[in-house]
Curated annotation (Swiss-Prot):
Protein name per Swiss-Prot or TrEMBL: L-xylulose reductase
Lineage: Eukaryota, Metazoa, Chordata, Craniata, Vertebrata
Membrane topology classification: Peripheral membrane protein
Role, per record: Catalyzes the NADPH-dependent reduction of several pentoses, tetroses, trioses, alpha-dicarbonyl compounds and L-xylulose. Participates in the uronate cycle of glucose metabolism. May play a role in the water absorption and cellular osmoregulation in the proximal renal tubules by producing xylitol, an osmolyte, thereby preventing osmolytic stress from occurring in the renal tubules.
Gene Ontology terms: cellular component: acrosomal vesicle; brush border; cytoplasmic microtubule; cytosol; membrane; microvillus
GO function terms (MF aspect): carbonyl reductase (NADPH) activity; identical protein binding; L-xylulose reductase (NADPH) activity; oxidoreductase activity, acting on NAD(P)H, quinone or similar compound as acceptor
Organism: Mesocricetus auratus (Golden hamster)
Length: 244
């Protein structure tokens, strides 16, 4: 199926590992020119080795001024994937200011900032575009020790709807994907304990965690012209977790 991504210019944050890295590879394979953003230069270097032709930007999205400087001259962007995130897990009574600030700065504030930069460019060019925010099932369900993380993702879902409302008249679509646990290398490590995994799997009707390609496929669909009447949606990639 042709997704119409060839020749489009895409920017992906959190591109060094996991979902972001796989999204970069899939977009380039579909013919897009990709700008990969990560705070870790070594990850970007290995990405370029694996995927020559990818443009890279190394910046910590928690730093507003550095992000503005790094992305202000990134050039025209047609497609944006806001994937960068942190998950600092603490019991509610032990939540620290540092964890709160870092989580909201990366998971929400950076989405606003990067999307503003990209959307302003689209509007100035009179060009349509698509933005996908990588959210989580944690936006809609309370999970132990996830007070701050769940809050950032709940806010991201509403931000997605607000962006869709205000950017729609400019022909810019905005959607979110909401995965369950994803079997990235980190996911496999964090959920390697069979007892811990069983507690979550018992709440998933399909009885399995998501693979990275499940999430990437959803992202590419929402970026593509195949979803050109879809905006403001939050698409679960969760095996049915949110229906339980």
């Amino acid at each position: 199926m042709d997704l119409g991504l060839a020749g489009r210019r895409a920017l992906v944050t959190g591109a060094g590992k996991g979902i972001g890295r796989s999204t970069v590879l899939a977009l380039q394979a579909a013919g897009a020119h990709v700008v990969a953003v990560s705070r870790t230069q070594a990850d970007l270097d290995s990405l370029v080795s694996e995927c020559p032709g990818v443009e890279t930007v190394c910046v910590d999205l928690a730093d507003w001024e550095a992000t503005e400087q790094a992305l202000s001259s990134v050039g025209p962007v047609d497609l944006l994937v806001n994937n960068a995130a942190v998950a600092l897990l603490q019991p509610f009574l032990e939540v620290t200011k540092e964890a709160f600030d870092m989580s909201f700065n990366v998971n929400l504030r950076a989405v606003i900032q990067v999307s503003q930069i990209v959307a302003r460019g689209m509007i100035a060019r009179g060009a349509p575009g698509a933005i996908v925010n990588v959210s989580s099932q944690a936006s809609q369900r309370a999970l132990a020790n996830h007070s701050v993380y769940c809050s950032t993702k709940g806010a991201l879902d509403m931000l997605t709807k607000m962006m869709a409302l205000e950017l729609g008249p400019h022909k810019i679509r905005v959607n979110a994907v909401n995965p369950t646990v994803v079997m990235t290398s980190m996911g496999r490590t964090n959920w390697s304990d069979p007892h811990k995994a069983k507690v979550m799997l018992d709440r998933i009707p399909l009885g399995k965690f998501a693979e990275v390609e499940n999430v990437v496929d959803a992202i590419l669909f929402l970026l593509s012209h195949r979803s050109n009447m879809t905006t403001g949606s939050t698409l679960p990639v969760d095996g049915g977790f949110l229906v339980t």
